[in-house]
Amino acid sequence: MGLEEKLPSGFLLSTVETLAGYVRKGSLWPATFGLACCAIEMMSTAGPRFDIARFGMERFSATPRQADLMIVAGRVSQKMAPVLRQIYDQMAEPKWVLAMGVCASSGGMFNNYAIVQGVDHVVPVDIYLPGCPPRPEMLLHAILKLHEKIAHMPLGANREEVIRETEAAALAATPTIEMKGLLR
């Protein structure tokens, strides 16, 4: 004998955060930041075979002010890093970042001084998508995982605190060029 049985039909019990998360996850507008071959796979997700529009991403935004998801596809050079950060800063809140491909995630095979060894040293990354290049199906799966994360993201002051902690942790992480083991 739960609460659902005592309420008349037509009532829905939820919180504002849960409802806002449900609405926000279905209306992402991505700002594409295609820098290499991963961008080709990202473009193919908008085609009829994979149809990213069925997940609420009807159009890719050409301006960061109208986007809330940045898909960084490919390697980021040291000269491109300030541009990436500027575009991220121009995006309105709430905003999310998806690092598409191993080059965006960790520098990939370009382990040299000219390439940023992971975009998480420039912007906070919410979802990492491995692969060289990752298939469109993998991008769609990563977007669905991001939908789950968005649905459980707090609002207001709680969200600002989570964002500050996430960004501080990402920028304080050890650069992959300094790591030992399989990465070197």
Curated annotation (Swiss-Prot):
GO terms for cellular component: plasma membrane; respiratory chain complex I. It catalyses: a quinone + NADH + 5 H(+)(in) = a quinol + NAD(+) + 4 H(+)(out). [4Fe-4S] cluster binds at residues 37-38, 103, 132. It comes from the Bacteria. It is an enzyme of class 7 (translocase). Its cofactor is [4Fe-4S] cluster. It is a peripheral membrane protein. PROSITE patterns: COMPLEX1_20K (PS01150). Gene3D superfamilies: 3.40.50.12280. GO terms for biological process: aerobic respiration; electron transport coupled proton transport. It holds the Pfam family Oxidored_q6. One of its GO terms (molecular function) is 4 iron, 4 sulfur cluster binding. It is found in: Cell membrane. Binds 1 [4Fe-4S] cluster. Its EC number is 7.1.1.-. Keywords: 4Fe-4S, Cell membrane, Iron, Iron-sulfur, Membrane, Metal-binding, NAD, Quinone, Translocase, Transport. NDH-1 is composed of 14 different subunits. Subunits NuoB, C, D, E, F, and G constitute the peripheral sector of the complex. HAMAP family: NDH1_NuoB. Belongs to the complex I 20 kDa subunit family. NDH-1 shuttles electrons from NADH, via FMN and iron-sulfur (Fe-S) centers, to quinones in the respiratory chain. The immediate electron acceptor for the enzyme in this species is believed to be a menaquinone. Couples the redox reaction to proton translocation (for every two electrons transferred, four hydrogen ions are translocated across the cytoplasmic membrane), and thus conserves the redox energy in a proton gradient. This is NADH-quinone oxidoreductase subunit B. It comes from Mycobacteroides abscessus (strain ATCC 19977 / DSM 44196 / CCUG 20993 / CIP 104536 / JCM 13569 / NCTC 13031 / TMC 1543 / L948). The gene is nuoB.
